[in-house]
Amino acid sequence: MTYQFSHDDLIWKALGDARRRLIIEVLATGPKQTGDLVQLFPDIGRTGVLKHIDVLTEGGIIHVRREGRTRWNHLDPEPIRSVCNSWVAKHIDGIKSSATKLKLIAEKEQ
């Protein structure tokens, strides 16, 4: 049996790498040319950065627009917001329960 990755899985995958998170932070300040992003990572070069951009694009986190030979990268924060809100909503009851237990333990120790 083969696991089918959901769109949420693609977003979590995209967020799972420090370089991709830095690209997201940089794009949060506004669209950037691919060349500008390549300069952030001289150790992996253009090919490496393009692979990271592909992962972010696959998750819908960034959109690439071409103007002639220039590639402009734009952030779309909505997929990140959506997947995080969904995850928190799914786990909030367990988090609240753990917080309540922790509070009771702390009160007993006082």
Stretches found by the model and what they are:
Residues 58-68, 74:
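Beta-hairpin "wing" of winged helix-turn-helix
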Residues 6-47, 70-82, 86:
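N-terminal helix-turn-helix DNA-binding core of bacterial DNA-binding proteins
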Residues 33, 62, 106-110:
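Charge-dense, helix-prone N-terminal extensions
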Residues 53-54:
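Short, hydrophobic-biased segments on the C-terminal half of alpha helices
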